Design a protein with these regions (language model features):
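Short, non-transmembrane alpha-helical segments in secretory-pathway proteins
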Residues: 19-49
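Noncatalytic regulatory segments and standalone regulatory/sensor domains
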Residues: 23-24, 28, 56-57, 79-127, ...
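Active-site-adjacent substructure of cysteine-protease-like catalytic cores
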Residues: 45-63, 256, 260-320, 328
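Short, compositionally biased P/S/T/A/G/V-rich stretches that sit at domain boundaries
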Residues: 342-413, 426-430, 497-541
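Extended low-complexity, serine/threonine- and proline-enriched intrinsically disordered segments
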Residues: 413-441, 544
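Aromatic sugar-binding surface patches on proteins
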Residues: 441-463
Length: 544
């Protein structure tokens, strides 16, 4: 029977949950030597003292390049490495810092029991499967931002806005393909600080020949500067760039920009919308086809984007951070597997949500990417999305059952026009029956545009008739169908367990629908490793 009462309980909380084991800097140094050709390693410059004894990761500079190793022995030992350059903790590209912050939070989540540790045995001397494809080492400052809006800084000096990492990543992809010869169309938008920002792409012919790999001070001409600055401006405008000292754009702006203004086929894949193995396969397949991709993450300070253009036998991805070549190297992008989250982890357990953008020039004879629906459930306003049964269970076989889809998001990278439903699947995964199709439409019966990156924060009711379902155990999943397409399961694996027996039907959510509605206070000291008690109020909204 479903318990609907709100209950008051006392919970004994430990001040420390230790699943992993912190390793010392000396132990990390020994690990780093395994990945050095000469065995000569040194702690990275400017590592603060508070990060050297209880660190989530350790960075060591080599004679050439650097290595980053995990600070926890339950994790994969190697985190990332570079064959050139050095690591300076005080001069880390923001995109890389986001990734490192995410890793640090992942280690903390593992050590507190909120996430599963991921440990894979690696080769000490990995070989490259796909060599880095992109040769440009571009940045966000001059001359790249020469055509960006101007602003006045705190010292009353006129400065140019940064191009934005999103534009720099996009521009490097386009330079790799040297495409298109000329843009398409016109676009403008209103910016709260700079007014109307616009570009007439159709008037712009891109001077690919005069875009060089490196723009070192005093080593490029005005023509070369203008060539790259125009490309950067057009990329920024097409992405609806929020210009400023630090500029940013949404991952969901990429695919429309590539398609509408630059004659590319493009597809956006959100990591939350597919299994890690599939996500990795999409990346490696694209790289093996000789096409670099854009990798995006969203953190507390906004979105970041960078280029992934190769990988090694450990499946570490080669990253071009878009910071003038600084810190480019091979990194483990699989450490934040969403499947490793524990109960309560949800989609907000780590600092960034991840996705990739694929792009290929839409030339004659080139097949465009297939549109793949990526509808899924997300955490919104501290409410976890999912699929829930509205009524009391069990019910009589033959009755209609109302099933709610909560916090449904479109992560497809393109607008969705179509219908939602629920499907009943047997133990073999075969579709047995479906509910009533619910078209997303307006009052005139026209399909609504479910824009990319948006969500329905209201519960969407689906109706399932249980007549004709044979006795047995089933799984009920949310389904979507783009207009003129086929039914597909939601990318989220959320489901209901259905049991049909003796004329009764029972639907149970395997995902707890429990919310914290109140928490008491604790008067006293809390010591590491010692338990303490506090009263909290929770509400069980689950089917059981």
């Amino acid at each position: 029977m479903k318990r609907t009462t709100t209950i008051l309980i006392a919970i004994c909380v430990s001040a420390l949950f230790a699943n992993g084991k912190q390793i010392s800097q000396n132990a990390a140094l020994s690990a780093a030597r395994k990945y050095s050709r000469t065995g000569q390693v040194a702690p990275a410059k400017n590592l603060r003292s508070d990060k050297t004894n209880n660190a989530p990761y350790y960075a060591f500079n080599l004679e050439q390049g650097y290595v980053i190793v995990s600070g926890d022995d339950e994790m994969t030992e190697l985190v990332g490495y570079a064959e050139n350059g050095f690591f300076d903790a005080e001069n880390v590209p923001p995109q890389m810092q986001l990734w490192l912050d995410g890793y640090a939070e992942y280690v903390a989540a593992v050590q507190s029991g909120k996430a599963k540790a991921r440990k894979i045995l690696l080769s000490d001397s990995p070989s490259v499967v796909v060599e880095p494809l992109v040769t440009t080492k571009w940045n966000q400052d001059a001359p790249f931002n020469n055509f960006a809006p101007e602003y006045t800084d705190d010292n009353n000096n006129t400065q140019r806005c940064a191009t934005g990492c999103a534009a720099t990543a996009m521009a490097q992809i386009m330079k790799f393909h040297n495409w298109p010869e000329q843009g398409v169309g016109h676009y403008s938008y209103e910016h709260q600080s700079f007014g109307t920002i616009s570009s007439n792409f159709s008037e712009h012919v891109y001077d690919w020949t005069n875009m060089i790999d490196r723009y070192n001070n005093g080593e490029y001409s005005n023509v070369q500067a203008d060539a790259v600055a125009l490309l950067m401006k057009d990329c920024g405008v097409s992405l609806n760039m929020n210009y400023g000292p630090v500029s940013g754009a949404s991952i969901y702006s990429y695919t429309p920009a590539f398609k509408n203004y630059f004659r590319y086929s493009s597809r956006t894949v959100n990591r939350s919308g597919c299994e890690t193995a599939e996500f990795t396969r999409i990346i490696t397949d694209e790289l093996q086809e000789g096409r670099p991709i854009i990798y995006c993450g969203t953190g507390e300070d906004g979105g970041h984007a960078f280029v992934v253009d190769g990988y090694d036998t450990n499946y570490f991805l080669h990253v071009n951070w878009g910071w003038g070549g600084y810190s480019d190297g091979y990194f483990d992008m699989n450490y934040m597997d969403p499947a490793g989250l524990g109960i309560g982890g949800g989609s907000g357990a780590f600092k960034w949500n991840q996705g990739i953008v694929l792009a290929r020039p839409l030339k004659d004879g080139v097949e465009p990417y297939e549109f793949i629906q990526q509808l899924c459930f997300v955490l919104f306003n501290d409410v976890q999305g999912g699929i829930f049964c509205k009524q009391e269970m069990p019910t009589n076989k033959g009755d209609d059952v109302t099933i709610l889809l909560r916090n449904t998001a479109n992560l497809s990278g393109e607008s969705f026009f179509g219908s939602l439903n629920v499907g009943v699947f047997d133990d073999s995964g075969a579709l047995v029956t479906m509910g009533n199709e619910e078209r997303l439409e307006n009052n005139n019966g026209e399909l609504l545009e479910f824009q990319s990156g948006r969500l329905y924060s209201v519960d969407l009711p689906m109706t399932l008739n249980t007549a004709g379902i044979a006795d047995g155990n089933y799984i009920v999943r949310a389904m979507s169908k783009a207009n003129g397409n086929v039914w597909r399961k939601f990318a989220s694996t959320d489901c209901l367990n259905m049991t049909v027996a003796d004329g009764k039907v029972s639907l149970v959510s395997p995902t707890p629908n429990i919310s914290l509605t109140g928490i008491g206070s604790y008067n006293g000291n809390v010591y590491k490793g010692n338990p303490f008690s506090v009263n909290i109020t929770i509400h069980n909204g689950s089917s059981i």
